[in-house]
Amino acid sequence: MVTMLMFLATLAGLFTTAKGQNFHLGKCPSPPVQENFDVKKYLGRWYEIEKIPASFEKGNCIQANYSLMENGNIEVLNKELSPDGTMNQVKGEAKQSNVSEPAKLEVQFFPLMPPAPYWILATDYENYALVYSCTTFFWLFHVDFVWILGRNPYLPPETITYLKDILTSNGIDIEKMTTTDQANCPDFL
């Protein structure tokens, strides 16, 4: 009984200390991904338009650049302008985890960390992309992340509404989504 109470207290602590993270009871949902996904069309620069806040992203002017590697995987280079004015960047590698579902990628930024899901739920390749990531912990709860990306620093409101409708129709909570400030950003990619 004491062990269970300690576990529940630890779990409650996780929920309260992970400011901005989107924790939910139960396993991750499994929304449909972009049909006939073409990774080559997806390559290039994307600007972060909106997101569910993530502890590993604290800045503004967030951009990602995807390029094809010699081994067939995708190099991921994320950059942001931190609150103190310095530019932070992290480089990772993404790969398609299942050939029959090419829009389901896995991305890894650090060798000792397990890869994280990176699912492209929707994209037209030229204007917008909707990315979803979710990890289940202990079969009891999950944490998810959402990114709305654009080829330009801003997307029309109707496009953002369309993408958010995809999320809500698949049971993904958008309440905590925030807009990423892309104003007065340096061109650092």
Curated annotation (Swiss-Prot):
Tissue specificity statement from the Swiss-Prot or TrEMBL entry: Highest levels of expression in brain, testis, virgin mammary gland and salivary gland. Moderate levels in skeletal muscle, lactating mammary gland and thymus. Low levels in lung and lymph node. No expression in kidney, pancreas, liver or spleen.
Main localization, broad class: secreted
Protein location: Secreted
UniProt entry tagged with the keyword Secreted: yes
Stored InterPro entries: ApoD_vertbrte (IPR026222), ApolipopD (IPR002969), Calycin (IPR012674), Lipocalin_ApoD (IPR022271), Lipocalin_CS (IPR022272), Lipocln_cytosolic_FA-bd_dom (IPR000566)
Biological process annotations from GO: brain development; glucose metabolic process; lipid metabolic process; lipid transport; negative regulation of cytokine production involved in inflammatory response; negative regulation of focal adhesion assembly; negative regulation of lipoprotein lipid oxidation; negative regulation of monocyte chemotactic protein-1 production
Disulfide partners: C28-C134, C61-C185
One Pfam family cited in the UniProt record for this chain: Lipocalin_2
Keyword line: Disulfide bond, Glycoprotein, Lipid-binding, Pyrrolidone carboxylic acid, Secreted, Signal, Transport
Manganese among keywords: no
Xref: CDD domains: lipocalin_apoD-like
Signal peptide: 1-20
Cellular component annotations (GO), alphabetically ordered: cytosolic ribosome; dendrite; extracellular space; neuronal cell body; perinuclear region of cytoplasm
Subunit structure of this chain's protein: Homodimer.
Protein family according to the UniProt entry: Belongs to the calycin superfamily. Lipocalin family.
The protein's name in its UniProt record: Apolipoprotein D
